[in-house]
Amino acid sequence: MFGFQRRGLGTPRLQLWLLLLEFWEVGSGQLHYSVSEEAKHGTFVGRIAQDLGLELAELVPRLFRVASKTHGDLLEVNLQNGILFVNSRIDREELCGQSAECSIHLEVIVDRPLQVFHVNVEVKDINDNPPVFSLREQKLLIAESKQSDSRFPLEGASDADIEENALLTYRLSKNEYFSLDSPTNGKQIKRLSLILKKSLDREKTPELNLMVTATDGGKPELTGTVRLLVQVLDVNDNDPDFDKSEYKVSLMENAAKETLVLKLNATDRDEGVNGEVTYSLMSIKPNGRHLFTLDQNNGEVRVNGTLDYEENKFYKIEVQATDKGTPPMAGHCTVWVEILDTNDNSPEVAVTSLSLPVREDAQPSTVIALISVSDRDSGVNGQVTCSLTPHVPFKLVSTFKNYYSLVLDSALDRESVWAYELVVTARDGGSPSLWATARVSVEVADVNDNAPAFAQPEYTVFVKENNPPGCHIFTVSARDADAQENALVSYSLVERRLGDRALSSYVSVHAESGKVYALQPLDHEELELLQFQVSARDAGVPPLGSNVTLQVFVLDENDNAPALLATQAGSAGGAVNKLVPRSVGAGHVVAKVRAVDADSGYNAWLSYELQPAAGGSRIPFRVGLYTGEISTTRALDEADSPRHRLLVLVKDHGEPALTATATVLVSLVESGQAPKASSRTLVGAASPEAALVDVNVYLIIAICVVSSLLVLTLLLYTALWCSATPTEGACAPGKPTLVCSRAVGSWSYSQQRRQRVCSEEGPPKTDLMAFSPSLPLGLNKEEEGERQEPGSNHPGQPRQPNPDWRYSASLRAGMHSSVHLEEAGILRAGPGGPDQQWPTVSSATPEPEAGEVSPPVGAGVNSNSWTFKYGPGNPKQSGPGELPDKFIIPGSPAIISIRQEPANSQIDKSDFITFGKKEETKKKKKKKKGNKTQEKKEKGNSTTDNSDQ
């Protein structure tokens, strides 16, 4: 490494200097090794890992690798033992020519952290090239007049090796005339010459064949030979002589063709043709015969090709001057041409990618790539500086001479810029300067930093009921700004339970397309609104997701035919037997057909038609179009048939309409043969006060108590529900949309069906409370104000009724036959308040046309819905002291009638009773107290047939 002489330095001090020197070499990041050329594959060069201070176990994890600009495949490192070895054939002459120094520069790169070490491996020469003569045969013309000791220069051999391996010795084959004078020192300045030992005698020996052998100084020795053909000439005994034996000339490498290098001059002391000289080129080294020309007459040497300083810095030209004597004589000289450098080479840029692509969350100062620059020129022309494209989040950092690192300068965002095209510019210091560029494409790798996003927070979907299983009802789509698997969105249901069933039993979502399918036919009567959430989640790590709300409204279809309710004659749909006295007059109600429809809206609006009698005969009966009441059209007489078979067609208003047929058998009897129920009815009709003492009065009282308890329970339950955290239900936030199958006239199935349940502004009004079991979620406060109808004091939010609130078996037997809405029903908000159109229950009237134009009460409400009604059933208001015609039983569509009829009218006691306003209730109580005596008298006759209820 270095040598030290002991000049008074002690051994400890010398060791300290050696230790400091060793630390200096390690800190500089350079190692030096040597290897012989032509070494076999696997030849040991050095323990590079140990010398660099690296552990063998960390070579592979730290991506230990060796790189070389031009000779990367000659040497390799075994990552198992950290040994640098020969990987392929090394030819020193091919690498460095005859340069005295020859080394291979390596870059050792390791990651985590990134470190770069520089290693120089010196290639030692071996004797692998024999001496070579440029010609296989050299011809010499020697005049016989030559004196002894005359010298004849020969072209020596060349050896591609260096130092001792290129040190040549010559020997001449045995002969009596010539000896060989060869160079004896290492520099070999002395020319190889053939020396004449004694005079020649052409007549005796006109020609000589000699062999010159060149031997190098290597071990083992290698030799080369050339044949010398010596022809002995006569007379001409003076050689041409140059002014100098050697010439030195400097020439710019960009010299143009035909540029004069120099003009040689040789003279011959002979006279005549023996003194005329011609010039010729013997050799130009190295390989420059095509670069120069020599005029054989005037001795001018000119440029004939393109000179390149980077290829050869010197040329050696051997020139021979020959006279025209017989035999001709020759003189020799050497011309040394030095090539001067010009800035004719652009810099070269080499980029080694290390960390591409770059993650968008990479930290600043992250090394992206290594860049090396070089320039084949020398001096200032070979000094190179680098620059980078401006306004990019990267920068160049110089790590070593002509080596740079491309590092991250600021944060990246792939969603803004997904790739950068960087231009590295290398510029030399020449005048004018030359430059070169290299492009580096830096792709930004995606990181999962964006969640899938839906276009809307919620969607409203309308689906008709009875859809086929697997029906596609909607498609959700979410967009993810990331790329590849980070943008691969999959969809799934946010599972929850709907009652006792899981949401996944109703709908499913295709994981890839986002298509929402109904797994089973939906039933409007069972489920009007299906609200659920769909989750979109990407495939990144960790995955990100978002939810969207779907409100699926199930639209009603006319899929339920009218159903006849049970009558006193037997099961539903059976024939009803009625006995009618012949003495009744026109308008007498004989019977009432009761039917319900499970559909809603127009699909549940029922109408009744009396089928024509057989044979086309006219019958004295008709049926109310919407009431189902069968009444007489005229007074009966003896001419009428004693038995009538009436077929009543019950039809809804759906498309197509569905029907049911009820059979009523009417028997005309004499007044004395009428049943007791009819007698009781007649008595009640004759005495209006006696009807109030009927058992129905007790039923009214019981119903009032039960209804009050139900209302109180409902209000308490609603208050507790609204005070809790709203999730889903009557008080939950959202944007409900009501589904309306159609709207006709002044009636529509709209927001008017709602009444406030859980408002924070005070107790609800008692004028009307309407509950629907399948309305969507309530509005928020802003939307409540927008949707509130004029004249309405409080916006309402419906709630699902308790499924336990059902009418009893005794009440179910007397359910009203036709439940519908009045077209002109009037709701009064209070004294002087504005009137509103609200769905009500029509009162049965003796007039056949009364209430027959009303829309259905079940528009959107099934048979399990229940409604409190306070107010009249038609525009006609009850007068003071009058009782309301009907009351609606909470939890049941049944109507109990307490309407008073004329004495000659027969009213079916199965009509349901409706509740009037508070004032009317008080009036009824007064009437009840005023008729206590009559109530006791009629107590024995108060038992009625349950079928009439």
Swiss-Prot record:
Biased composition (Basic and acidic residues): 780-789, 908-922
Pfam families associated with the record: Cadherin (PF00028), Cadherin_2 (PF08266), Cadherin_tail (PF15974)
InterPro entries: Cadherin-like_dom, Cadherin-like_sf, Cadherin_CBD, Cadherin_CS, Cadherin_N, Protocadherin/Cadherin-CA
Job of this protein: Potential calcium-dependent cell-adhesion protein. May be involved in the establishment and maintenance of specific neuronal connections in the brain.
Segments on the Cytoplasmic face: 718-949
Membrane-spanning ranges: 697-717
PANTHER family referenced in this protein's UniProt entry, alphabetically: CADHERIN-87A, PROTOCADHERIN ALPHA-11
Gene3D superfamilies: Cadherins (2.60.40.60)
Keywords: Calcium, Cell adhesion, Cell membrane, Glycoprotein, Membrane, Repeat, Signal, Transmembrane, Transmembrane helix
Entry annotated with the keyword Signal: yes
Name of the protein: Protocadherin alpha-11
PXXP repeats: 733-736, 773-776, 795-798, 831-834, 872-875, 890-893
Superkingdom of the source species: Eukaryota
Topology with respect to the bilayer: Single-pass type I membrane protein
MF terms (GO), sorted A to Z: calcium ion binding
UniProt region (6 X 4 AA repeats of P-X-X-P), positions on chain: 733-893
GO CC aspect terms: plasma membrane
Biological process, per Gene Ontology: cell adhesion; homophilic cell adhesion via plasma membrane adhesion molecules; nervous system development
Membrane topology, Extracellular segments: 30-696
Signal peptide: 1-29
Cadherin domain ranges (all copies): 30-133, 157-242, 243-349, 350-454, 455-564, 580-677
Residues carrying covalently attached carbohydrate according to the record: 265, 304, 547
Signal listed as a keyword: yes
Region feature Disordered, mapped onto this chain: 753-807, 826-858, 870-889, 900-949
